[in-house]
């Protein structure tokens, strides 16, 4: 449904192609509608700086437009860095509206001047008189009360610390080297359809090749572990993540002990998905088998 709108937008004073950008903004807001009247007010000085700039190119346009076109205009205005201000009014809601781009209700120059005038107002200084206290009163806390409070606090701390140690001890669970190897074999057999057919054996060569590729191509934005888990098939793995990380921790300690390639020693296991943890364990086992 077409409605009548009056829109004002200001372009940055340093915009390279003012005509092209203003035409694009007017074309967006008038899509599936029509332009009734428009006016280029030119380069006008602001009442106060906007984005550290003193001037801007003002444009006023009266259009019949759809709600979708208005939303798209506002979206592009938020993205385009050279559009510094926008203001849109629905003329059907304005009482006594007079259609004119010369007497535009969206022209913010008067509004800015009023704001600037208000800033010049200074609140009169009123000196307050404070009565000086005639005497200072000191409150002495009874020694017995202080001792009792300290004893209670110490006892509470002791009671709180003890169960915390038990919880920490309960969480520690060690696995052997052999158990880790058996677990990897079990995962390979169970998820054969979701894992890579072969494991990279020459890790150092892969690192060198990746370094060359990285130097030639710009770095792509890195996905988080949660984002990668949605696309790499981790949802097909039934085991809990803490169980996979438990065996991965063991194999990483073996990789450090056997001085395997740094890529296997310095990996951040917390940043790996379920599938990536299984692939990591396969790589460590393959490196140990050399």
Curated annotation (Swiss-Prot):
Any coiled-coil regions, as ranges: none
GO biological process: translation
KW Electron transport (keyword) present: no
Keyword tags: Ribonucleoprotein, Ribosomal protein, RNA-binding, rRNA-binding
Pfam families attached to this UniProt entry: Ribosomal_S6
GO molecular function: small ribosomal subunit rRNA binding; structural constituent of ribosome
SUPFAM superfamilies named in the record: Ribosomal protein S6
Keyword Ribonucleoprotein: yes
Region called Disordered, residue ranges: 208-233
InterPro entries, per database record: Ribosomal_bS6 (IPR000529), Ribosomal_bS6_sf (IPR035980), Ribosomal_S6_plastid/chlpt (IPR020814), Transl_elong_EF1B/ribsomal_bS6 (IPR014717)
One Gene Ontology cellular component: ribonucleoprotein complex
Family: Belongs to the bacterial ribosomal protein bS6 family.
Matching PANTHER family: MITOCHONDRIAL 28S RIBOSOMAL PROTEIN S6, SMALL RIBOSOMAL SUBUNIT PROTEIN BS6M
NCBIfam families registered for this protein in UniProt: S6
Protein known as: Small ribosomal subunit protein bS6
């Amino acid at each position: 449904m077409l409605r009548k709108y009056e829109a004002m937008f200001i372009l940055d004073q340093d915009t390279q192609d003012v005509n092209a950008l203003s035409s694009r903004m007017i074309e967006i807001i008038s899509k599936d509608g029509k332009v009734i009247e428009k006016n280029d007010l030119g380069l006008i000085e602001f009442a106060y700086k906007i984005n550290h700039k003193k001037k801007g190119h003002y444009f006023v346009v009266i259009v019949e437009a759809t709600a979708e076109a208005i939303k798209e205009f506002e979206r592009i205005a938020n993205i385009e860095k050279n559009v510094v201000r926008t203001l849109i009014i629905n003329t059907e809601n304005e009482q006594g509206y007079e259609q004119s781009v010369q007497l535009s209700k969206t022209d913010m120059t008067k509004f800015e001047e009023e704001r600037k005038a208000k800033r010049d107002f200074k609140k009169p200084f009123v000196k307050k008189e404070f009565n000086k206290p005639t005497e200072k009163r000191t409150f002495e806390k009874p020694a017995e009360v202080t001792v009792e409070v300290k004893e209670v606090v110490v006892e509470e701390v002791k009671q709180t610390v003890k169960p915390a140690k038990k919880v920490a001890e309960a969480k520690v669970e060690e696995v052997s080297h052999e158990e880790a190897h058996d677990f990897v074999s079990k995962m390979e057999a169970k998820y054969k359809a979701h894992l890579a057919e072969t494991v990279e054996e020459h890790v150092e060569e892969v690192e060198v090749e990746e370094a060359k590729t990285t130097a030639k191509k710009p770095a792509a934005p890195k996905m988080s572990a949660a984002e990668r888990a949605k696309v790499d098939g981790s949802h097909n793995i039934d085991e809990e993540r803490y169980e996979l990380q438990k065996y991965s921790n063991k194999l990483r300690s073996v990789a450090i002990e056997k001085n395997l390639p740094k890529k296997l020693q310095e990996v951040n296991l917390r940043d790996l998905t379920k599938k990536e943890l299984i692939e990591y364990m396969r790589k460590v086992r393959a490196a140990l088998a050399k």
